[in-house]
Amino acid sequence: MSVEIRQEAAGDILNIREVTRKAFGREVEACLVDRLRGGGHARLSLVAEEDGRLVGHIMFSEATIRTEETGVGALALGPVGVIPERQGQGIGSALIREALDRCARTGHRIVVLLGHPDYYPRFGFSAERAGNLSSAYSGEAFMALEFVPGALSGVAGEFEFAPPFGAAS
């Protein structure tokens, strides 16, 4: 069986909701995906499809780093989920790698996430890189990745996820 990673299509929305609900075992993240998409905050949404069935999903949304002088554009990764029976088989990693590659190719400079500190460093994320960013979620799970080396040099401020993240907590 081959897994294809592709851009989300309008006909995928209900299936993405189901994949996300199953992956997390609750509705919160599925509602977050719906709100990010519905509010125009989503910047990239990819699905993993196997034999005509969605088995995974990843979304990146707009975010801002509020500095003293200005706002610096960034992306937030998440949610990313894979249905339970296909977890641990590389689908999540493939989604993340493909999505990061697409974001880098389209000129994005910074991506931040809140995720497992033992998982995301393999993709280049680091809590240290997010060290000058303040957030209600600061800590070892709050990590950043620079698509452009030095993109976070001299950048300090409040990291703001898109508004639906506040409604999801």
Show where each model-derived region lies.
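Short amphipathic alpha-helix that is part of the acyltransferase structural core
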Residues: 1-33, 39-55, 74, 149-169
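Conserved acidic functional residues
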Residues: 8, 115-116
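Conserved acetyl-CoA binding element of GNAT-fold acetyltransferases
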Residues: 71-84
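Conserved acetyl-CoA-binding loop-helix of GNAT-fold acetyltransferases
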Residues: 82, 88-101, 113
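Conserved GNAT acetyl-CoA-binding A-motif
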Residues: 100-115, 128
